[in-house]
Amino acid sequence: MGTIDEDMRRVVEEQRLGYAATVCPDATPNLSPKGTTAVWDDNHLVFADIRSPRTVENLRHNPAIEVNVVDPISRKGCRFKGTGTVLAEGTLFDEALAFYRRRGVANEIRAVVLVQVGRAMPLTSPAYDLGATEQEVRERWERHHEALRKGESGAPTGE
């Protein structure tokens, strides 16, 4: 069995938006959303370099990366720690490019980042620590998002 379990795979495939944290050359953090985040295999994630110059530059200097993927309604997700490799040519790059084209990604893809996941952990909202059920959390955040669609404001509290 790999590092990425079936539930983690499901979350990544459903959400597709991951947040990648890398380290800048001056040792400051860089956090960047990656709308092409996908599970490549049981031990790897992948995302496309569409507009990621800082992320790619950082990984070329320091391959340390963490990717977080969270369902904004259930407030559950996954944290993946590992190393990222930037691929701009070769068989794996070609396979990843074909993968994204099949998914309908039409943007220019300059490279892909293959993340070797060394550690994968679940993420959950503190609301669960207080005894909230997933249904309660989902209902609370569905109401919030519905209010936003209607032009209302006011986020749920306690999370």
Whereabouts are the PLM-identified features?
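Beta-strand secondary-structure signal
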Residues: V46-A48, E66, K81, V112-Q116
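Short, surface-exposed beta-strand-loop junctions and turns on beta-sheet-rich folds
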Residues: T37-A38, P53-R54, V86, L130
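Short, basic/aromatic recognition patches
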Residues: M1-L17
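Short beta-strand segments
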Residues: Q15-D49, V67
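C-terminal edge-of-domain segments
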Residues: T83-A88, L92-E159
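Short, structured beta-strand-loop surface elements
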Residues: L17, R54-F99
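Solvent-exposed alpha-helices and their adjacent loops that cap or buttress functional pockets
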Residues: R10-V12, A38-W40, V105-N107
